Each structure stands twice: as C-alpha cells, then as structure tokens.
C-alpha cells in the first residue's frame, strides 16, 4: 500500500492524533510559560536563588526523556497527566533562562532613567524591563515549543496519545506508512510553530533608529 493510499484510508485517525498532539503540546507550553516567566522575573531580583534554580532546571534537562516519562508513569500513572508534567518540566528551563538573561542584560541606563522620572518598581518592570526583554523571552518560548512538539511523540509510550502513537505502533509492526503518518505531521507542525514564533520575535524586536541622511 502506498503512503497516499494509507492516508486516504486512515486520514481521520491521523487528524485525530494530530489534534491530540497539538492539545498536549499547547497545554504544556502554556503551563510552562505561566510558571517560567514570573519565575525568571523573580530570579532577576535574587541572584543567589537564580543560580540554584537554574542549576536544578539544568539538571532536569539532562535527564533522558524516557527516564522522565518512566518516573512520571510511576508517580502519576498512565495518560496525559504525567506526560504534561514531564513536558512542562522540560519546557521551563529555556523560558526561565531567557527571561532572566533578557531582563538582566538590559542597560542600567534605561532603569536609571525610568527611576529618574519617578516610575515605581512595578512600572519599571512592566513598562521598561519586560518590553525590552521580550525578544529574549520569545526566543526562549520558541526553543521550548520546538522541543516540546518533538518530545511529545514520546508521550504516547505512557498512554497520552498523539502522533507518537502512530510512530511507535508503526515501529513495533514495521509499518512504514504508519511511521510516516506520525513523523511527517510532527515535523511540519514543529516547522510551522517555529516560523510563527519567528514572526512574533521579529515583531517584538526593537528596530534600529534611522537617522535622516544615512545611506
């Protein structure tokens, strides 16, 4: 059977797997963003804590995905819950790091100027630090999104479903069409997500000022 014929016969199953994969990845990224960005901001005010938190997050990143999923399975059982917990743990580090770095590397002159015109600390955060650090934050989110879409294929091993179901079932049954039906949409999804976030990154990145008379 050709791959095109396989898709004609099983297109609805592939679309359902894609839907689950998108939901699993989106939920994991959303939770990671809600945790990581505030944490990264808080860490910019506490350098000692930042070193410890980033070190722990870095250690988590070095643990193989299958090991983390196995731990999630033992602690939380089968299904999407352990998969989301593991994916969130993996997604957090790049966002925390980029949030922390993006804000810490802002030129102190901007902060001093904001204080000089009477801005409060919260005003400085929301009107100066976050806007200037946003390109770095978005870059961290992009990295996490691409990683999570790929790592979510492993979640099928603990019953979370998604495109990984097709890949792992295809591998176990030596069904090339099934493997491709899972791998190709996952790759395309990752590429599209990366391109969309690249556009967002360009939109939030400050443009250099043009001086009249410059070539």
What is the role of each PLM region?
Residues 1-28:
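Periplasmic/extracellular loop-to-transmembrane helix junction in inner-membrane transport proteins
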Residues 26, 89, 122-154, 186, ...:
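Transmembrane alpha-helices
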Residues 26, 30-38, 42, 88, ...:
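Generic alpha-helical transmembrane segments of integral inner-membrane proteins
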Residues 39-71, 87, 97-101:
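Cytoplasmic-entry segments and transmembrane alpha-helices of multi-pass inner-membrane transporters
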Residues 47, 104, 180-215:
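C-terminal transmembrane helix and the adjacent membrane-cytosol boundary/short C-terminal tail
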Residues 99-137:
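Short cytoplasmic-facing helical segments at TM-TM junctions of multi-pass membrane proteins
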């Amino acid at each position: 059977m050709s791959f095109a014929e396989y898709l004609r016969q099983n297109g609805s199953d592939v679309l359902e797997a894609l839907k689950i994969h998108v939901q699993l990845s989106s939920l994991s990224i959303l939770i990671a963003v809600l945790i990581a960005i505030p944490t990264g901001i808080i860490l910019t005010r506490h350098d000692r804590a930042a070193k410890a938190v980033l070190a722990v997050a870095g250690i988590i990143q070095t643990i193989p995905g299958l090991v983390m999923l196995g731990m999630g399975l033992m602690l939380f059982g089968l299904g999407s819950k352990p998969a989301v917990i593991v994916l969130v743990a993996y997604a957090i580090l790049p966002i925390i790091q980029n949030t922390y770095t993006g804000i810490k590397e802002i030129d102190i002159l901007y902060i001093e100027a904001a204080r000089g015109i009477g801005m409060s600390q919260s005003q400085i955060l929301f009107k100066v630090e976050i806007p200037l650090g946003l390109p770095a934050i978005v870059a961290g989110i992009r990295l996490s999104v691409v990683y999570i879409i790929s790592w979510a294929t492993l979640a099928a091993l603990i019953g979370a479903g998604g495109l990984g179901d097709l890949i792992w079932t295809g591998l176990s049954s030596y069904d090339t069409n099934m493997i491709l039906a899972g791998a190709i949409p996952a790759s395309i999804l990752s590429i599209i997500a990366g391109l969309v976030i690249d556009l967002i990154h360009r939109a939030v990145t400050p443009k250099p000022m043009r001086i009249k008379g410059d070539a």
